[in-house]
């Protein structure tokens, strides 16, 4: 340490601590950097004392400077540190590392220039070392220094052929000759296996060199020969020859660099052998610091033999992809391609010392908290341990595990057969007995023969031979010592509950009362001398009592229960006396509806909860075809989590929910633990994501939650809960193996214990569906037997409602509970609700009414986007019962792309809306239940700002209310919004009640009919009545369809220069009037609107306006009354003032009178004239064939707006919208066929489902023979494998069946508008008839016009997938299918092979690439997304799993003729 401590004096040390590591950074140099630099110097053979002076640092820098450009990160860091120390010795003031480097490099350059030219070595152009030096014009070889050789040997010995060896060799061998490189290799004494691998690579590369560089003819005397492979390797050449080859004037051969590259290939192979970790396996642990993960990643990356582009891709994708979830979340927020410095800075706090310190502090706090010692444990501590006796042979001095005698059969505890000691009834006393599936005990007290009833007893209760039969009795030893304990269970309840005493059961512990659970287990206890009655509740984590005072030494705490959150006082180390036993535990006091002893006290008493497993047949489950179960290693866990998981798993194993996995089970899924809400208990979680991916898919059996408004009104209601629902359903035994998980041990002290689930696990994708299916099977018989009783079941919540008498209703509930208990389901008493109000699914229910549970809006100083989202969710939930709830302005606060944690600034409108909602929520609102036979009605009311409210009711009884505030269009009107409201209510009513209500809408029938006649957009209009509830929905202005006669006509236009944003808007009238307005910072659309507004302002009460803008026409035609645009709002106000308005649209300016004139008027200096010569041919084409919009756009190059207007202007192409139906089978060979009728003729139509291609013709009769002939004609033209028709007589005839059988196609039948129906051909019949109507006047006979219409539909109708016509699409699909089949057949030969290859003069092998094709002279390979052609002599083909026979190493390694014959015969090449 002498040199280390004397590197810098005290003053210089102070100066060092002021220097920053990076310019502008926060971190500064400290002493640890000097200590690190001293250790690193030893690797380069440099003395530590050199750092003590300026001259010594200068010497270090002269050695390191040539190595910096090709050196590792450690080398560069060492160089930077020495630069800083050099500046401190030279008394140079520096602020950061970069300044120090500049100063040091300036001094190095000056010293080099001062050296004499004859003595200064001139480095060859290839490197920074100087084995070959140019002195006086001659190249002289200087042997490698011992320092260099020592550094190389130390590198190999320390790193053991790690990833650092390759760049280290590159740096140390820079500029070396083969002689020098061989000297370096000979210095490595050990690792001869690695040396042999390098020698084999050298021999292989030398042979390739000789093959590529054949020996030329005889050379003239005195001329230097060209190097052979052995010359490059230094075995048959001298140092002088090597120098001449490297530095000759003509055709130099860098033998040193070539040999270095061969050695690098060998070293990389050794690195992969010594370090088998793949770069893909480098993943960050859950608590691993990000910097440590990055170090491991780059260490493995440096060992990868691939090009820099691939390494760059690995850095950009794998580094983030394989980070743990915490770091990955932070890294994704950095955007695309963050730098490594940004990633390290962002993740430095995750998994680092700070986080570890917090975890350690939390663990230490928990460890220092004195845990209450159970009574039995205290007894064992108090007494001395007796002599060890073997349970197997009975001898003293060893345990059963050490016993060498044959294993005794049966139980080691009681000697009986049929069970093992861990499950012995005399050893294990539980809160609930585990009931077998074969013989179940009744939960009701009237079953006297129920043996094994659920009981409570403390551990080590009765002695051997103890009789515990009889579900409602107390065991004999307990009965003899419990005083009045027999009265406790007499008829399930007792008027007087006396304290019970317990007796010590000899040396076996103690005996406690055991009592039936057919009633609530309520006992009397004394807490610090204060008597209370408490419920023993195994479902509660903590213990809470009311009505007692325990002093002021408490901690305030809030706990959650059925009724919400409760404020409590927590007292620790409180003395409790219960069932004759004293314990000390933590207890809370507060306003609880019932006193509860939870698991913290029950565990101290030694009580356990044993759940039965349901007697339900397991549902068979399989993995997806070709998939295997998860095999993911368990990641490291902290000590406290391991202990918590161990306790949880042991408990679940005792309860029959888990069992040990056999050692032959190869599957594993990671497990971990998290703290519960109270932060005192742990919850076990299994990461089933991989298992969910490979598990078969399940059907969602329940698509939503039930709503109380859909319940029928009943006299009595009861709510009960199924406890630990998933853990009551058995899992398919054949599938259990895939749920295996492992509990690791601390410091790997023992093998991890492995478990598999016997019941439905939480987190597995199949658990919800299987549970719902099982519950439906259990409840269906009960529902049928009690048809007058309503049973609503959602997951583990069950609601029972009936009009029966109280006694009959209670009997039904008891029968249902008994049924569930007999099937193995538990029904916890603490969640059993017999009296109103019933808390169910977020609602409070009474027999005659329902309401929402209390809603409390949050009060916050600072609001984030996430807070606003939660607030809107609460308000939307409340809107189903509270009328008038609005969220429009609150939702506007989070419009646009915002992060969840971004702070939100409230607007005045949003604050006012929130306050109004708070006032509404303060009022009491109640809903009613549904009454059969009473008409269902829906009343809609319009509020301000386009917000709508509605109520669904039966007379004056309100069932449900709601709101609607979605505005899908920027410019809209009330009728369109009203239509959306009606659709929403209709869907809602169908789901809840299964019927459509009668609507009361605030609109006049004339307004509604007028709007829907012109702008029909939906397929369903309900029955409705007019309601005169202001404000009424009205159409604000009179927009007529035909031009007004004797009224001035305005031609409007606007234009804008995109570069300058300057524009003009104006109009020209048919009476010679015109006007132009100059605009700034505008757009074409805004200019068009300005021109329209000018025409409205300057015109009279009646006006004709002609526009050439589809944008303006679309806005005006929709008759908007609401808009967010000030300009459109101005237009609306002007239009309201008019008596009548006609608005027309023209597509072109040429030859259209005033429209052409106004275009010239506003275009001067603004835009060029748009030539639309192709409009007239497009109109002629459409009048002939009536093609669609996309066909006109494709063929004539028209803008889509112009093409759309051409189609819309055609009176024969005007049609209403069509309903959207279910999906159909769209495979390539699927056709649908149907018959339709027109003009007394029968037209048979066949449609190719995938492409929409149609075949149609007129047939004489609708018979099976004619249909079969058409089917044969269709099959002779197109591939057909599946035909779908309706159930008509001609399609089900024997003729059609025989034709289908002969062709080899599958025929199916269906009904309209089902997913497997003939809906495609039904729709095509409609389109065919429309097309025939358009061209009917072009042909005489119906036969001709049908074929003409089919031609138009197949070749003149473009759109859909690929923007093709149906004919193009069908041909494309057939061609694609053939290509796929061809390439699949070819690819099967090569799919198991990979190719390593070399390119150009580069001798480095690259790959692997995927083999696509193997020809005689070359192979076709795929590398990433790039496809390459590689000569055979530069390619090696191997099996991807390695170890196979190489096929292409050159002409001497494969018989070309044999390979060609094999490829031609279609065989797969052998590996």
UniProtKB/Swiss-Prot annotation:
Zn(2+) binds at residues 1182, 1186, 1210, 1213. The record marks 130-131, 360-361, 377-378, 430-431, 443-444, 511-512, 611-612, 1049-1050, 1170-1171 as: Cleavage. A lipid is attached at residue 2 (N-myristoyl glycine). Its cofactor is Mg(2+). A motif (Tryptophan repeat motif) lies at residues 1008-1024. Residues 513-517, 561-567, 600-612 are annotated as: Dimerization of protease. A zinc finger (CCHC-type) spans 388-405, 409-426. Binds 2 magnesium ions for reverse transcriptase polymerase activity. Binds 2 magnesium ions for ribonuclease H (RNase H) activity. Substrate-binding is a precondition for magnesium binding. Residues 1044-1167 form the RNase H type-1 domain. A motif (Nuclear localization signal) lies at residues 26-32. Protease: The viral protease is inhibited by many synthetic protease inhibitors (PIs), such as amprenavir, atazanavir, indinavir, loprinavir, nelfinavir, ritonavir and saquinavir. Use of protease inhibitors in tritherapy regimens permit more ambitious therapeutic strategies. Reverse transcriptase/ribonuclease H: RT can be inhibited either by nucleoside RT inhibitors (NRTIs) or by non nucleoside RT inhibitors (NNRTIs). It catalyses: Endopeptidase for which the P1 residue is preferably hydrophobic; Endohydrolysis of RNA in RNA/DNA hybrids. Three different cleavage modes: 1. sequence-specific internal cleavage of RNA. Human immunodeficiency virus type 1 and Moloney murine leukemia virus enzymes prefer to cleave the RNA strand one nucleotide away from the RNA-DNA junction. 2. RNA 5'-end directed cleavage 13-19 nucleotides from the RNA end. 3. DNA 3'-end directed cleavage 15-20 nucleotides away from the primer terminus; 3'-end directed exonucleolytic cleavage of viral RNA-DNA hybrid; DNA(n) + a 2'-deoxyribonucleoside 5'-triphosphate = DNA(n+1) + diphosphate. Keywords: AIDS, Aspartyl protease, Capsid protein, DNA integration, DNA recombination, DNA-binding, DNA-directed DNA polymerase, Endonuclease, Eukaryotic host gene expression shutoff by virus, Eukaryotic host translation shutoff by virus, Host cell membrane, Host cytoplasm, Host endosome, Host gene expression shutoff by virus, Host membrane, Host nucleus, Host-virus interaction, Hydrolase, Lipid-binding, Lipoprotein, Magnesium, Membrane, Metal-binding, Multifunctional enzyme, Myristate, Nuclease, Nucleotidyltransferase, Phosphoprotein, Protease, Repeat, RNA-binding, RNA-directed DNA polymerase, Transferase, Viral genome integration, Viral nucleoprotein, Viral penetration into host nucleus, Viral release from host cell, Virion, Virion maturation, Virus entry into host cell, Zinc, Zinc-finger. It holds the Pfam family RVT_thumb. Mg(2+) 2 binds at residues 1053, 1088, 1108, 1159. The active site is at 537 (for protease activity). Residues 7-31 are annotated as: Interaction with Gp41. Residues 533-602 form the Peptidase A2 domain. This isolate is from a Gambian case of 'neuro-AIDS'. This is Gag-Pol polyprotein.
